[in-house]
C-alpha cells in the first residue's frame, strides 16, 4: 500500500476528477476485456471450428488467471508501489492483443492459433488483476485513505462502463478488420494507457514489513465471506435472468439487465459519501436488506413489472456492498499490507461468481428457475447476519485485532 499523502480538503468535482484521472487506467484494462468478449466465443466455434467447450474455455482462462494472480498483484503493489503495478498490468493487456494478432496470423494451423488465443487470455487475466488492484491503491495514494470508499466505488463504475462499451465496440472492430482489427484495437487501447500512465507522479510504497499471506487472510476473510454470499445475488441476475424471463414467457430480459446496471452505477454516484458518514458495516447491512427484498421480488414475481422492480432493487443493494465491506477489510491490516488485503478480499468475489453459475444451474434443474433467486436471497440474509455479528463483536474479537501468528 502506498504511504498516505497529506490529505487536503478535496471535495466534490475536484476530488472526483483526481480519482477518475487514476481509475481511467482500470477503465482501459477492462476495455481490453470487453472488446473481445462478444467476438472470441463465436470466432473459436464458428471460424476455427472448435466445440462450444473450447469456446467457453478460452473466455474462462482469463478469469482463472485473474483469480490466481490477484493476491500477488496486491503484494507487489505494497512492495513496489501501485504505479509500477498498473504499468505492468497494462503491458499485459497489450500482450494479450499481440496474442490475438499472432493467432490470426497462425489461423492456417488451428491448434497453434487456439494456443495463442489461450495464452493471450491468460496474460490478459494477469494484466487486469495487476492494473485493477494497482489503480485502486494508486488512487488512494493520490487522494488519501479517507476517500478509499469513493475510490473503490469509482473503480466499479469505470469497470461497468468499460465492459458496456467494449462488447459492442469489439463487434464493430471485428466487422471492420476481423480478428486482426480487434487485436490492433486492444493493443492501441493498452499502449495509449501506458503512455498516459508513465508521466504521472508515483506514490511511494510503504517500507514497513509485510505480513505473511496467512495473516492477511486471517484478518479479512470474514469480510470476504460476507462479500461472497452477497455476490450470489449479482451472479444469478447476470447469468440467469434471461432464462427466468423465458421460463415465464415474458419479454424484456435485456431491459432488466440494463435496469440492474443503471441502478448499480446510479447508486454509487448518488451516495458517494455514504460509507464515510455511516460506516462500512452499517452501509453493508442496509445494502443487504435492499438486495434481499429485490431478490425476493424477482423469485416471487407474478408479473414482469415485479421482476423489473426486483432487479432494480438488487442492483441498488449490491452496488455499495463491495466498497462498504472493502473499506473495513483494508483497514483491518497495517498500511504496508493494504494492497494484499484488498486483493485477498476481492478474491472472495471472484470465487463466488465462479461457483454461483454451476451451483445455481443445478438448483434450477432440480427446482425451477425462480427458486435460485429465493436461494440467493437466503445467502444474502446470511451475509447480513454475519455483518451484524461483526458489528456487535468487541474490538478485541474483530479480525483486525487478531494475531498475525
Curated annotation (Swiss-Prot):
Keywords: Cell inner membrane, Cell membrane, Membrane, Transmembrane, Transmembrane helix, Transport. One of its GO terms (cellular component) is plasma membrane. GO terms for molecular function: transmembrane transporter activity. Its main location: membrane. It comes from the Bacteria. It is found in: Cell inner membrane. It is a multi-pass membrane protein. Belongs to the major facilitator superfamily. YhhS family. The chain crosses the membrane at residues 19-39, 48-68, 85-105, 106-126, 129-149, 156-176, 178-198, 224-244, 252-272, 283-303, 309-329, 344-364, 366-386. The gene is yhhS. InterPro entries: MFS, MFS_dom, MFS_trans_sf, MFS_Transporters, MFS_YhhS-like. This is Uncharacterized MFS-type transporter YhhS.
Amino acid at each position: 500500500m502506498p504511504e498516505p499523502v497529506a490529505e487536503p480538503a478535496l471535495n466534490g468535482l475536484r476530488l472526483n476528477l483526481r480519482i477518475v484521472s487514476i481509475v481511467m487506467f482500470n477503465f482501459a484494462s477492462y476495455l481490453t476485456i470487453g472488446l473481445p468478449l462478444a467476438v472470441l466465443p463465436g470466432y473459436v466455434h464458428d471460424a476455427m471450428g472448435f466445440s462450444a467447450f473450447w469456446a467457453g474455455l478460452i473466455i474462462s482462462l482469463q478469469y482463472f488467471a485473474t483469480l490466481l494472480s490477484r493476491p500477488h498483484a496486491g503484494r507487489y503493489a505494497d512492495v513496489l508501489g501501485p504505479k509500477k503495478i498498473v504499468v505492468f498490468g497494462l503491458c499485459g493487456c497489450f500482450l494479450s492483443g499481440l496474442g490475438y494478432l499472432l493467432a490470426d496470423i497462425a489461423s492456417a494451423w488451428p491448434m497453434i492459433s487456439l494456443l495463442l488465443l489461450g495464452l493471450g487470455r491468460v496474460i490478459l487475466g494477469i494484466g487486469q488483476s495487476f492494473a485493477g488492484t494497482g489503480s485502486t491503491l494508486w488512487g488512494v495514494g493520490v487522494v488519501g485513505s479517507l476517500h478509499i470508499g469513493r475510490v473503490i466505488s469509482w473503480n466499479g463504475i469505470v469497470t461497468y462502463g468499460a465492459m458496456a462499451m467494449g462488447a459492442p465496440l469489439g463487434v464493430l472492430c471485428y466487422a471492420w478488420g476481423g480478428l486482426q482489427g480487434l487485436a490492433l484495437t486492444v493493443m492501441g487501447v493498452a499502449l495509449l494507457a501506458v503512455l498516459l500512465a508513465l508521466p504521472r507522479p508515483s506514490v511511494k510504497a510503504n517500507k514497513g514489513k509485510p505480513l505473511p499471506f496467512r495473516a492477511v487472510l486471517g484478518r479479512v476473510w470474514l469480510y470476504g465471506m460476507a462479500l461472497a454470499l452477497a455476490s450470489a445475488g449479482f451472479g444469478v441476475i447476470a447469468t440467469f435472468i434471461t432464462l427466468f424471463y423465458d421460463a415465464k414467457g415474458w419479454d424484456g430480459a435485456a431491459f432488466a439487465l440494463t435496469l440492474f446496471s443503471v441502478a448499480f452505477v446510479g447508486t454509487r454516484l448518488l451516495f458517494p459519501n455514504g460509507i464515510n458518514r455511516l460506516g462500512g458495516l452499517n452501509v453493508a447491512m442496509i445494502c443487504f436488506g435492499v438486495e434481499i427484498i429485490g431478490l425476493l421480488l424477482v423469485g416471487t414475481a407474478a408479473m414482469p413489472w415485479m421482476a423489473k422492480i426486483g432487479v432494480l432493487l438488487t442492483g441498488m443493494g449490491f452496488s455499495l456492498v463491495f466498497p462498504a465491506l472493502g473499506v473495513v477489510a483494508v483497514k483491518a491490516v497495517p498500511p504496508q499490507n493494504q494492497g494484499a488485503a484488498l486483493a485477498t478480499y476481492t478474491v472472495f468475489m471472484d470465487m463466488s461468481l465462479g461457483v454461483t453459475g454451476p451451483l445455481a444451474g443445478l438448483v434450477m434443474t432440480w427446482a425451477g428457475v425462480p427458486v435460485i433467486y429465493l436461494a440467493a436471497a437466503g445467502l444474502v440474509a446470511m451475509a447480513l447476519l454475519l455483518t451484524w455479528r461483526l458489528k456487535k463483536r468487541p474490538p478485541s474479537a474483530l479480525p483486525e485485532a487478531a494475531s498475525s501468528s
